[in-house]
Every structure is written in C-alpha cells, then in structure tokens.
C-alpha cells in the first residue's frame, strides 16, 4: 500500500503512521526538487525577500550514500560589504573536513549581528532541506561552525536551532545574550585564544566552560562538550581550532531525544524537536524541560 488517500480520514496504526510519514516526505521532496533545481548551480537562495549566497566544496566519499554538511560562518560584521566579502572568501577555505559538503554562506547583511538576525533561522532551514533533497545530505549529520562574528552566530544559533544540528563548533566569538540550555542533545565545542581579550571573549569562554560543565554534571546524559582555550593565542588561533571538525564528526543528530530542554531566545520558535507551541506561546525567556519514557 503506497497511497496516502487510503490513509485519510481515520486513525492510523503505528506502521501506517510511519508509512504516511514516508509518503508525505516523498511527495514533498519531489516538489522541492522541481522548485529548487537550480539552487546549487546558482549558489543562492531567496526566502521571504532575503537572499543568502553560498559557496561549497565537496570532500571525500559519501557514507552509505549520504554526505555530511558543514555550514561555516564567516567573521566581520559591522563593517563594509567589501570587508565582509573578504571574510567570506577566507571562510571558504578555512576548514577541510575529511568527508562532506563544506558550505560557506555570505551573510545577507553587514551588521554586527549578521549571523543571528531572525531571517538566518528560516534561511538555514531552507538551505538544509534543499541540500538534503538535491545533494544527498544526511539530515542527521549537519554541523554548524563559525569564526569571530561567525562564532557569535554559533553561540546564538546552536542552542536555538539545536534540533537541526548534530554538533556545533564556536571559534573566537562572543555569546552576547545567548544561553546554552538548548545544547542538551548535541555536541558543542568552543575554541578560544587565551589572549583574545576584546569584549572579554577569553573570560566569557571560561565562564561558558564552567556553565557547560555544571549543566553536564546536573544532567550527565546531555551537554556533551569540549572547550579548548589556547593560552599562547590571541584572536587568531593559527589553525589549531580545526581540531574541532573531527570531534564534531563523531556526533549524529537524534531527532527524537528522550529529554529536551527548550529555551526561547529573542528570536522565538514554535517548534523544537518533538515539542510545539503556538506563536502566542513562543515568548522570549520561556524555558521548557520535557521528558518521555
């Protein structure tokens, strides 16, 4: 039985529900393939009037027919378009995973908070789903990383979009108002120069190291993390931060974890893993801790 119409209008068994999920995905994927066929060649997506340009390189061979995806965020921010373009060019070649699609997007804006504006969330959702359909990306092996202002973005996006990531790597950034609660079910690594004193980045990295350590002590099944502070380095870590990639690669996303910690950032969401709320209930600062047996 491969017909959705047969399943409509009645309750479903567990097996039928799984089948319906597969059928709905097949139908959606076919539509997406048709509508987004030129995206990879164009190197650009537009969602709700906001454009995100990107460039990518493919490394290694697929694993069981699927590829990992590394989304790597450039630095800059709060400067000229030309300066941010230069940062983007640098980010395109900054890291080299052993396997997967290494994709460096160009932030749509040139503001200081270029990677944690509200439009970034829906752009990345669209980007990930496109690569799942068009480039055989494994949705459970999607990784986020970023340097400097890109690291600022990772601090923000890793917890608030944690249900999309397997792991995330923050390099040389500052969290601003971000909190780590949503990181419960992903791997999170933080790399910082011990002499990176601007905006107290080095001190804040140590605070997050302690914070993550306490979260894991209180919840030993969650908050897997690795923090590396290099005492000899300032803002530039001379490539030592690339050690984050093989550490991240050991993680796979669990779409249905038994325990979820959901913190609403200033950019709110109406769903997180298997939880959902109405738009009216998605309030900044709300925290939900939910478990299933």
What feature does the model see in each segment?
Residues 66-133:
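Active-site machinery of serine-nucleophile hydrolases
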Residues 65-69, 98-102, 138-142, 161-167, ...:
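Loop/turn elements at helix/coil->beta-strand transitions in domains of secreted/extracellular proteins
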Residues 76, 107-108, 194-197, 232-233:
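Acidic beta-to-alpha connecting loop that harbors the catalytic carboxylate
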Residues 60-65, 113-149, 160-164:
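Gly/Ser-rich "nucleophile elbow"/oxyanion-hole loop immediately N-terminal to the catalytic nucleophile
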Residues 140-184:
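Primarily recognizes the serine-hydrolase "nucleophile elbow" in alpha/beta-hydrolase
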Residues 1-68:
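A domain-start/cap signature at the N-terminus of enzymes
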Residues 189-193:
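Short beta-strand/loop motif that positions the catalytic acidic residue
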Residues 197, 203-293:
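C-terminal catalytic histidine-bearing segment of alpha/beta-hydrolase fold enzymes
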């Amino acid at each position: 039985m491969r017909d959705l119409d047969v399943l409509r209008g009645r309750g479903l068994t567990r097996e039928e529900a799984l089948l319906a999920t597969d059928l709905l995905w097949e139908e959606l994927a076919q539509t997406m393939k048709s509508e987004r066929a030129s995206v990879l060649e164009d190197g650009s997506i537009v969602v709700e009037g906001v454009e995100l340009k990107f460039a990518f390189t493919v490394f290694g061979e697929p694993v069981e027919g699927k590829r990992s995806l590394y989304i790597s965020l450039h630095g800059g921010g709060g400067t000229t378009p030309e300066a941010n373009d230069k940062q983007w060019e640098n980010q395109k070649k900054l890291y080299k995973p052993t396997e997967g699609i290494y994709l460096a997007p160009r932030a749509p804006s040139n503001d200081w908070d270029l990677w944690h504006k509200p439009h970034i969330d829906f752009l990345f959702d669209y980007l990930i789903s496109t690569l799942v359909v068009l480039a055989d990306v494994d949705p459970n092996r999607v990784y986020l990383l970023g340097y400097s202002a890109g690291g600022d973005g990772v601090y923000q996006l890793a917890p608030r979009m944690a249900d999309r990531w397997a792991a995330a790597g923050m390099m040389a950034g500052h969290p601003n108002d971000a909190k780590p609660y949503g990181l419960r079910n992903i791997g999170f690594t933080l790399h910082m120069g011990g002499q990176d004193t601007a905006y107290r980045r080095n001190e804040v990295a140590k605070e997050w190291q302690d914070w993550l350590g306490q979260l894991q002590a209180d919840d030993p099944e969650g908050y897997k993390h690795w923090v590396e502070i290099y005492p000899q380095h300032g803002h530039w870590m001379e490539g030592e931060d690339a050690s984050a990639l093989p550490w991240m690669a050991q993680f796979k996303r669990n779409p249905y974890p038994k325990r979820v910690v959901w913190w609403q950032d200033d950019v709110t969401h109406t769903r997180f893993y298997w939880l959902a709320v109405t738009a009216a209930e998605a309030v900044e600062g709300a925290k939900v801790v939910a478990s299933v047996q």
